[in-house]
């Protein structure tokens, strides 16, 4: 009887469990010739394709992905957006969660497929993301989403159609592409001492072309702001590139530049190609389609739209939001926007327009959305956005998503999920260029090398002092605490204009609870909220893993933002700018969350000891001459009341 009772209890327990499937995948990373935009170059293929294969799972699947490095250089793979709850060793960051995967070696990543939604995977080894190591990653949700769809339409047919579309989305990987490899591009920057950010193509799912419109057309398509404030006495090049030798772009370091070192075809010398544009087929019988856009771009902000088809953004960075209707949306490096599109127009071929938003270059990519059975029909259309990212219709000005427009950026989580009213720990990070046009800091002066601690990942040494200078690159937090990260931009010497920074936190999402203009002058966030409550939102702020800092081409005395999160997932997590050029220039910091309850690392992920194969473990780099550094000390003490790499006691409590 006792055994039967025990068996019955066991069966009840088993019946209540949600069994997760174990799903295994293999990725082979290779360096080969390719021509995604019609121009041949060396690049990275994953399983023989670019972008890498789509990885699709169900929520809470136990994922096991074996990565084989068939290249002649190091690599890792980061699973961007995956929570990595309890598996920080699978995050794929050299020097934090693992050593590099060396040539000929393999690495097994094991983690839970969570949270549901749209994510992606990419290299986290220097700038090789832009060489092609990236792909889409999608997790189908368990939950019934009908309440979400009812906010778009109350028609039961529409709700059913959207439910189906969300589980079988069209994954749309956006990337920018250059004829130069990442190493060649960075060498051009170092040799010329100029920040270069011009590309040849914008691709969708690995397809695109090089367009060379007449220069007069490009000049007429240039956004008014950059033209008048950033380079008022010059024009864009025949590639649509902003002029490289311009103080409004390079800052005071333009006088140190060597423009003759810029290789041909980076800034000018447009060569058209015969590539091919991507076509996505949709079935009008389905009623709706979900297009999930992934910004795998290195430094471009793409203003995507579909001619004649408004769209509803319902998911941002793998987090469901209150749906918002737009006709165009600007998406920036690292972000993911999932949109619902109603298929109710005349069947035919409609252009998907993919221009740079106008903040870095006059360039566009194109693709096609084709109604099934109407491939050869081209209904008359009028674009929402033009080649240069300008408004093509009146509604574009009022119904577009622009991250600088705080009202348009109001997309609170669904269901509601507000943060705590107060924080336990606060850290001020003063960000910007430090000592040159292409070196970037997150901590006033110190640069985070891309190979920092490559052979001694901080996962294994969370409480060990990493060196006097290196300590400026590390923040340690306690488990369960609420943390505020205060980001200050456009106040460092020579960096008065607020350039974009796409800030991505690994390991957890953050709420953006506040924005403001000027220099951060408060001893705490609580004091700031009391002084200017209109600058904060604690009721229903947005929740994302990637946020864009404020942008202004005109020096305005600085801008600040406050991001809040709770430490619930102990581990070493990178916080960095997702513009590859800025990260390569040093704009990262290590957040060692929950050092008081650090997880036990499985034996299979222990540090390996072997001769170096081209990997360097570099120290933090103070990048300034002594006079500049002394000036910075005086500035930080007088204006912000803190020293570089430090916070006031109130900020570090």
Swiss-Prot record:
Top enzyme class, one word, equals oxidoreductase
User: Does Signal count among this protein's keywords?
Assistant: yes
Report the PROSITE patterns cross-referenced here: MULTICOPPER_OXIDASE1, MULTICOPPER_OXIDASE2
Q: Which positions in this protein are listed as binding Cu cation 4? A: 501, 577, 582
SUPFAM superfamilies given for it? Cupredoxins (SSF49503)
Which reactions appear under catalytic activity for this entry? Answer: 4 norrubrofusarin + O2 = 2 ustilaginoidin A + 2 H2O
Q: Which residues are glycosylated?
A: 74, 220, 235, 255, 277, 405, 463, 479, 623
Pfam families from the entry?
Cu-oxidase (PF00394), Cu-oxidase_2 (PF07731), Cu-oxidase_3 (PF07732)
Q: Where does Cu cation 1 bind?
A: 504
Secretion signal: which residues?
1-20
Enumerate the residues binding Cu cation 2.
578
Q: Where does Cu cation 3 bind?
A: 506, 576
The record, for CDD domains, names: CuRO_1_Abr2_like (cd13850), CuRO_2_Abr2_like (cd13876), CuRO_3_Abr2_like (cd13898)
By sequence similarity, the record places it as follows:
Belongs to the multicopper oxidase family.
Described function: Laccase; part of the gene cluster that mediates the biosynthesis of ustilaginoidins, dimeric gamma-naphthopyrones isolated from different fungal species. The first step in the biosynthesis of ustilaginoidins is the production of gamma-naphthopyrone precursor YWA1 by the non-reducing polyketide synthase ustP, via condensation of one acetyl-CoA starter unit with 6 malonyl-CoA units. YWA1 is then probably substrate of the ustZ to yield norrubrofusarin via a dehydration reaction.
Please identify the protein, giving its name as recorded.
Laccase ustL
Originating organism? Ustilaginoidea virens (Rice false smut fungus)
